[in-house]
From Swiss-Prot:
Subcellular location: Cytoplasm
This protein's record includes keyword Manganese: yes
GO BP terms in the entry: DNA replication, removal of RNA primer; mismatch repair
Protein's recorded name: Ribonuclease HII
GO cellular-component term (any): cytoplasm
Family to which the UniProt record says this protein belongs: Belongs to the RNase HII family.
PROSITE patterns: RNASE_H_2 (PS51975)
Listed cofactors: Mn(2+); Mg(2+)
């Protein structure tokens, strides 16, 4: 079929041409668009417009991919092979762990539609992208920091701890890290923190997708364990429904007791300094510098 001439293609039904050159995105033979433009059928003109629109979208996506790979490309050209993107998910929720992911993509990796997980609202699309990343990545790993750790060392440092665990979980040692906004502590690998990195680096975007989808699945499992709180729907974030059920049903073991709405539900002072609050909740809590994975 790929050797069909333009004349032969014009003998096909327009529905077949649509399936081949729009739905399946088969490369368009030279001269086909011009032949469709000259075809007296209105449907042929509409098909030519759809093919051109698809081609323009493909060009734009290709340009977006190249732009998202500029940090990786610079490092590849310097001789680095294994570049890991690192990102986290779940800093703001009132419940559940904070989860981080690290992803090492092969040189020249492309995945249509891959972007910062916050920009991809369709959960099924995120899952599809996550499966493609896991399938094609050189290596990937996730790490987490539990609620107790969040309350002991604060959410910022717990997020860093989850990131470090993700990097340490990789099956290959990365040559360089690209990290969303921060740098990973206690890590000897050279690294670069990129503000809004999940929107500027393909590797970080991949890690963002893995962290988000992994955490969402874990929250769905917690929803089965703690029914009635809507955890599968709001993922622990402080939605009006979550705040209401927190007041009505009380605090769960998976709620972050260092977060103001949870402290309020427990009847604890919401304005306590972190050190005083941690002393209240965890009398024997280790110092921040003593925290280990």
């Amino acid at each position: 079929m790929s050797a069909d001439t333009v004349e032969q293609l014009l003998q096909c039904a327009l529905s077949e041409l649509t399936a081949r050159f729009v739905t399946q995105a088969t490369p368009v033979p030279t001269g086909l668009l011009e032949a469709l433009d000259a075809d007296p059928r209105a449907g042929a003109h509409a098909l030519a417009r759809r093919i051109r629109s698809r081609q323009e979208k493909n060009r734009a996506e290709g340009q977006r991919m190249r732009k998202l790979l500029r940090f990786e490309t610079e490092l590849w050209e310097q001789g680095h092979t294994h570049i890991a993107g690192v990102d986290e998910a779940g800093m703001a929720p009132l419940a559940g762990p904070v989860v981080a992911a690290a992803a090492v993509l092969p040189k020249g990796f492309r995945l249509k539609g891959l972007d910062d997980s916050k920009k991809i609202l369709d959960a099924e699309k995120r899952e599809s992208l996550a499966e493609a990343i896991k399938r094609d990545a050189v290596a990937w790993a996730v790490g987490r920091a539990e609620v107790e750790e969040i309350d002991r060392i604060n959410i910022y440092h717990a997020g860093l701890l989850a990131m470090r665990r993700a990097v340490e979980g990789l099956s290959v040692k990365p040559d360089h890290l690209l990290v969303d906004a921060r740098t990973v502590p206690e890590c000897s690998v050279p690294q670069k923190g990129i503000i809004k990195g999940d929107a500027l680096s393909l590797s970080i975007a991949a890690a963002s997708i893995l962290a988000k989808t992994t955490r969402d699945r874990w929250m769905a499992e917690l929803d089965d364990q703690y029914p009635g709180y809507g955890l599968a729907a709001h993922k622990g974030y402080p939605t009006p429904h979550h705040l209401q059920v927190l007041r009505e049903k009380g605090v769960l073991p998976i709620h972050r007791r260092s977060f103001a709405p949870v402290r309020e539900a427990l009847g604890l002072p919401t304005g306590s300094p972190p050190s005083a609050l941690q002393a209240e909740l965890f009398p024997e809590a280790p110092s921040r510098t003593g925290v280990k994975s």
